[in-house]
Every structure is written in C-alpha cells, then in structure tokens.
Amino acid sequence: MDEATGIDVYGHNGMAVGDYDGDGREDLYVCQPAGLPNRLYRNNGDGTFDDVSAVAGVDVLDASTMALFADLDNDGDQDLVVVAGTRLLLFVNDGKGKFTLRESSGFQPSGATLTSVAIADYDRDGHLDLYVCAYDFWASGANYNAPTPYYDATNGPPNFLYRNRGDATFEDVTAPSGMGQNNNRFSFAASWADYDNDGWPDLYVANDFGRNNLYRNNGDGTFADVAAKAGVEDLGAGMSVAWGDYDGDGRLDLYVSNMWSSAGQRLTFNPAFADVAADAGVRASFQRQARGNSLFKNNGDGTFSDVTLQVGVEFGSWAWSSGFWDYNNDGRLDVFVTNGFVTGPDTHDL
C-alpha cells in the first residue's frame, strides 16, 4: 500500500541529526517513503545545506521509518543506522565523508516490519548496543496477524536486543538478556533511560494495541520486565516514549503518546456498548484506548503515578512522536507532540 498510494501506514518518516563529517556543525539525514531516496544534507555553516546523499552513499530507496547517527565502531566518527522495512541497515563512516553499507553486521532478517531503534551501552562495556522494535509482517507479506485481542494483543513479532562486539558487528542477545519476556507485541518505539538512578540504562517500549514494557537493567547483562509492578503498563495504543524531569525533582518521569478520540470515547462510554463488550474490564480497556497520552510521575521508589488528567496532557489527537523540551527557556520542561493521520474534509469530530 505504501508504494501504491504514498501513504505510510506506520506513520511519518523520521530524520536524524549528527555531525557526520566532524566539522562541528550538525547535519541532517531525512528518511523518505519507498521509491524516494533518503537525503543527507551537509551543513555549510551559513544557514544553508548541500545534498550529499549520493556522494556519501546513503541515498537509500527503501521505505525508511527512522535513522540514528552513532559511533558504533568507536573510531571517533558518526556511523548511520537506518530502519528500512524488514531490514536494519548499518552504514560505516570512513571519516572522509563517505559511508559503506556493512553487509556482515550481524543483524538477522526477521521478516517483520521494523519501526524504530534505540541505542545505549546497556552492559557498560564501552560499546553502543541496539534495541530494535518490530510491528508486524506487512512489509514482507508473510504471516500477517491482525492484533488479537485488539485491546491487548499478544500475537505480534519479537523485538531484538543486539549487543555490540566492539567492531560494529552485533550478536542477538534477546533471549539470554531476559528481553524475551512479554516480547510479542506490536512495538512502535523504545527509549533508554536510567529511571531508578542505579547507573544502568533501563528500557521502556511503547506498544500499539496493548500493554507496554519497562525492562529494568539488573546490572549483570539481564533485564526484568517490571512495567506492571512499576505501574506503567499503560494499556493503550502506544506510539512513542519520552523521558524527562517535568517537575524538577531530580527523577526522570515518563510520557507516552497514544491516541485521543472523541468518537471512541463517546462510543465506549455509551451504556449500549455493554452489549458489544459485556465484561467491564474489556470495556475499560477500550475506553483507555481512546483516552489519549499518559504522563507518569517517578515516585523515586521504582514506581510511577499516573498524573495525566491532573496535569492535563492527555490530549494529542492521533499522536506520534513526543518529547520534552524547554521551548520558552523558563527552566521547566514542556511537552511537544506530533500528531495527525489520514482523514476526510470533515474534521470536527477528530
């Protein structure tokens, strides 16, 4: 459908910012839909940019959802990771303005549609590791599964944790690390952060059609999914994750974007909806799906409190990416949410 209509069913295409040529200026890499080459724009330092995509060797034609610059081989320059359909592409920077696609990176094809990647040195060995989110098998055309049940689906493809061997080649450590726990969702995004201040990066995963994951780093190369215990499963339509200390108490709080729908709220809170979903718990799950975004305050004891409605940050329409940002320079973090989807000319009920 993407190629035929130009509509990306997995959301908008992302971009990455990084100084790929080491001149002290931030350059831009822009992901595109299938058939259009991705673009690398070199910053000239005077407010203008040059398109160096083809010269640099990163004009990928595959549908790309996101990219990240990171020094994955520890040679001092920024390499590039691109999430492209069912593949994760690693371009190694030669330090002279050109990239080479590494075919033997160790990334194994899963057949699933990949949506995003998060980077951190989870085992603190000095090498950056990758966590890769997968959504479904639409891009490959194989083993398509409709999310079942819709409000708490557990028939999605697995995500992957790749450990960096130190030379920008990777090994799949999903199972031995413990990240195979609850690893059957429809994942859109993940973000690393040390939420419990123990010095080890933890990981939150936003899943569509159901519960999210919070993988607490045990400090020995393994993780435990503590989302339920911490109070951040957030059973909804997870789209993105943002960490930030919104209340200035020195602890990282958690913002998760979902979907806000007035039509969905009207339908699911209608007494007649009980004829469709007789179980009260199921009805509550559908109602949560339409409530919108969530803000969880870090209590400092390994748990979080849902302060969404008190703070007033639930509304975001059909939300996608989100982030904390002090846009007015008052020393307090604000929240920015991108949103929107395909709709008709009548928008009053969105």
Model region roles, listed by residue range:
Residues 1-350:
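Acidic, glycine/proline-rich Ca2+-coordinating loop motifs
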